[in-house]
Regions:
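Membrane-interfacial and juxtamembrane segments of integral membrane proteins
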Residues: 1-141
């Protein structure tokens, strides 16, 4: 069901708190998914772990993590904790293409040290650039 009335966007402080909490959760997920192959494969895993393979592994693990949570309720655990929900710009749940596009478009902001926060400060609705481009928006849940 589309949003019947405008819904408030979370403030920058709430988003930053959610991002900090999310980074701890993601670090734990990545740690587990790096330790398991090393335990199962032993020394062989160390020989296979080139920097490029590690980067692709991280990218794919994070892709699955975020896209799955966004498609199943619009919230990661950190977003639930801070009462933030991701919806399409018309208020409906995300479609798979939107979730994937948002994930891919968010990387320049991550690589540039969170430059997307500056955009959100200037945006009339307080949304990130990658949300505008992907047709998504963050709302208070």
């Amino acid at each position: 069901m589309p949003l019947a009335r405008p819904v408030a966007s979370p403030g920058i402080a709430r988003r930053l708190a959610s991002m900090c909490y999310e980074s701890l959760l993601v670090l734990a997920v990545l740690a587990v998914l790096f330790v398991l192959p090393h335990l199962m494969l032993g020394v062989f895993a160390q020989r296979m772990a080139s920097p490029a393979i590690i980067q692709v592994h991280c990218f794919l693990v994070l892709l699955v993590y975020f896209v799955w949570f966004w498609l199943h309720g619009g919230q990661t655990l950190a977003m639930k904790t801070w009462r933030i929900r991701l919806v399409s710009s018309d208020g409906l749940p995300l479609r798979p293409g939107q979730a994937l596009l948002r994930y891919l478009l968010s990387w320049p902001s991550v690589v540039l040290g969170g430059a997307g926060l500056a955009w959100a400060l200037l945006d009339r609705d307080g949304q990130f650039l990658h949300d505008r481009l992907a047709g998504t928006r963050l709302i208070l849940a």
